[in-house]
Each structure stands twice: as structure tokens, then as C-alpha cells.
A protein has these predicted regions:
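Non-catalytic interface/linker regions that flank or bridge core catalytic/transmembrane domains
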Residues: 1-36, 139-140
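Divalent metal-dependent catalytic cores for phosphoryl transfer on phosphate-bearing substrates
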Residues: 31-154
Length: 154
């Protein structure tokens, strides 16, 4: 089951051409968050919107900060070019790599895959949004777990 989901997600990353609902996202985001969101690859923006909408449908009481974190949780992938073939390869392999210095080439792609929550959190000013983005792969809080679950359902 896990492998099937993983392969489906990798093919979507490679082939996806879905236009993100930027109007939905920009209506929720604040200040510099909008610029950060717009710097993201359209695939990552569309994914963030789907995660935010899934959370909102499941938890209508979701705090705005949670929805903003959902929209920005993969913003760290925008730190360097992250090509479709790199997304597929690093989705299959995940060697331990340090977050810094950020490298070019394939090593940099592995860094982005592993450390994108950190890279995104470092660019977000709101402490609540920052904390949720940082924990979206290793949730510590209730809303962090809910964000993680909504992200994993992709």
C-alpha cells in the first residue's frame, strides 16, 4: 500500500499540470507569506491548496494559522530549482544529508527533500505558522498531526 501511494505521488510530481487555486491561497496568506507562496513551483502550490482545503473540509474550526501553514508547508522546496526528475529520484532514495551548506546538483536535491520544512520555516515570520511548517513531517502538536495526515493523504 505504501509503495503504491508513493509511486502515484511521484508520477503526479512528474506529470502534474494542475493550476493552483492562487486566489484561495492569497486570500488567506499575509504580507511576505504571499511572496513566499508565489515563489513556489505550481505543483507545490496546488498541493498546498489541496491540503488546506482538505483540512478546512475536515475541521471547519481550523485556525487560520493552520491553513496558512498548509499552504506554505512545502515552500522550502523553492529555495533552489527542484526539477521533476530530481523529485522522482529523491522520492525513492533519502540518504542522510546536512541542511547546510546548500549544494547544487543532486546533493542539493536530497537536501531540499529532507530539509524543506526547515528551509520554509526560516522564511516565515509568524511563529505559529513557522512552528507548524517545521513540524509537518514530525508532528508534535494536534494541528501538526492533522497537517501531517492531510499532507500524507496526497
Amino acid at each position: 500500500m505504501w509503495l503504491g501511494k508513493r509511486l502515484a505521488r511521484l508520477f503526479r510530481a512528474l506529470l502534474a499540470q494542475e493550476a493552483p487555486d492562487d486566489a484561495f491561497a492569497l486570500a488567506l496568506l499575509k504580507g511576505e507569506e504571499r511572496e513566499l507562496y508565489l515563489s513556489m513551483d505550481p505543483r507545490d502550490r496546488a498541493h498546498g491548496v489541496r491540503v488546506a482545503k482538505r483540512l478546512l473540509a475536515r475541521y471547519p474550526e481550523a485556525p487560520e494559522a493552520v491553513l496558512r501553514a498548509a499552504l506554505l508547508h512545502d515552500a522550502g522546496k523553492a529555495l533552489r530549482p527542484y526539477r521533476p526528475w530530481e523529485r522522482v529520484l529523491v522520492g525513492l532514495l533519502a540518504p542522510p544529508v546536512p541542511p547546510y551548506p546548500l549544494r547544487q546538483g543532486l546533493l542539493g536535491a536530497f537536501q531540499v527533500r529532507r530539509h524543506h520544512p526547515l528551509y520554509a520555516a526560516e522564511r516565515i515570520k509568524d511563529p505559529e505558522v513557522r512552528a507548524l511548517v517545521l513540524e509537518h513531517h514530525a508532528p508534535q502538536s494536534l494541528w501538526g498531526r492533522r497537517l501531517h495526515e492531510a499532507d500524507r493523504e496526497e
